[in-house]
Amino acid sequence: MNRKKRSDRNHIIYEIVNTINGKSYIGITAAIGRRFHYSAKLRLQKHFSRARRENKDWALYIDMRENDESVYDLFIVDVVRGKALAHQIEVELIKEFNYELNSTH
C-alpha cells in the first residue's frame, strides 16, 4: 500500500547573501524535524555542490562558481507549515524584493 504524502511538513524559507557583492537568493527547503538551521545549511551545501558539478546558467550557480563558499551568509526568513504555502510566500518575496540571484528575476 502506498503511503499518503504529508502535506503538513514544515518548510524553511531561507536567504543566501553574497557578502562581497550584496546579491541575494531566496529559496525553500523541507525541514528535517525541528532542525531548521541544519536543514537550510544542508540545502546551501547542495547548491554549492550542484554549482560545481552542473553547468547550469542559473544566476546563483554562476555567482557561486565565481566566489568562495566563505563569502555567503545564510539566513532563515521563515518556517511555515506546508509546501504550497512556502512556495506562495517565496514567490511573493521574489516579486516584492530584489533577489538578484533568483533565475526568475
Segments (PLM) and residue ranges:
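Structure-specific nucleic-acid interaction/processing domains
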Residues: M1-H105
